[in-house]
């Protein structure tokens, strides 16, 4: 496990060693976080909230 910091509450987030950029993890604070590659190392950012597309 890799321990990263939550960008919302600054708490520790345990991320699996085999996590890939683009994966979503949920933290205790309720934030949905996206794993991304920050210059060769894993980091977390707030996941973009995508609404439903009704084709309108």
UniProtKB/Swiss-Prot annotation:
The keyword Zinc appears for this protein: yes
Alphabetical list of InterPro entries matching this protein: LysW
Keyword Zinc-finger on entry: yes
Location of the motif EDWGE: 50
Biological process terms in GO annotation: L-arginine biosynthetic process; lysine biosynthetic process via aminoadipic acid
Alphabetized Pfam families for the sequence: Zn_ribbon_LysW (PF21344)
Binding site for Zn(2+): 6, 9, 27, 29
Modified sites of kind 5-glutamyl 2-aminoadipic acid: 56
Entry keywords, A to Z: Amino-acid biosynthesis, Arginine biosynthesis, Isopeptide bond, Lysine biosynthesis, Metal-binding, Zinc, Zinc-finger
Modification type 5-glutamyl glutamate: residues: 56
CDD domains in the record: LysW
Molecular-function annotations in GO: zinc ion binding
Zn finger intervals (TFIIB-type): 1-34
Gene3D superfamilies: 2.20.28.160
Modification note: Formation of an isopeptide bond between the gamma-carboxyl group of the C-terminal glutamate and the amino group of alpha-aminoadipate (AAA) is catalyzed by LysX. The bound AAA is then converted to L-lysine in a series of reactions catalyzed by LysZ, LysY and LysJ. Release of the product L-lysine is catalyzed by LysK. Formation of an isopeptide bond between the gamma-carboxyl group of the C-terminal glutamate and the amino group of L-glutamate is catalyzed by ArgX. The bound substrate is then sequentially converted to ornithine which is eventually converted to L-arginine.
UniProt pathway: Amino-acid biosynthesis; L-lysine biosynthesis via AAA pathway; Amino-acid biosynthesis; L-arginine biosynthesis
Function field: Carrier protein that bears the covalently bound substrates for arginine and lysine biosynthesis; bound L-glutamate is sequentially converted to L-ornithine, while bound alpha-aminoadipate (AAA) is sequentially converted to L-lysine.
Miscellaneous field: Binds zinc ions via its zinc finger domain, as shown by X-ray crystallography. In contrast, the absorption spectrum of the ortholog from Thermophilus suggests that it may bind iron ions, possibly via the predicted zinc finger domain.
Assembly behavior: Monomer.
Descriptive protein name: Alpha-aminoadipate/glutamate carrier protein LysW
Gene assigned in the entry: lysW
């Amino acid at each position: 496990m890799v321990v990263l910091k939550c960008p919302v509450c600054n708490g520790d987030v345990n991320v699996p060693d085999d996590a890939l950029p683009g994966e979503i993890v949920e933290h205790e604070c309720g934030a949905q976080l996206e794993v991304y590659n920050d210059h060769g190392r894993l980091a977390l950012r707030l996941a973009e909230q995508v609404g439903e597309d009704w084709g309108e």
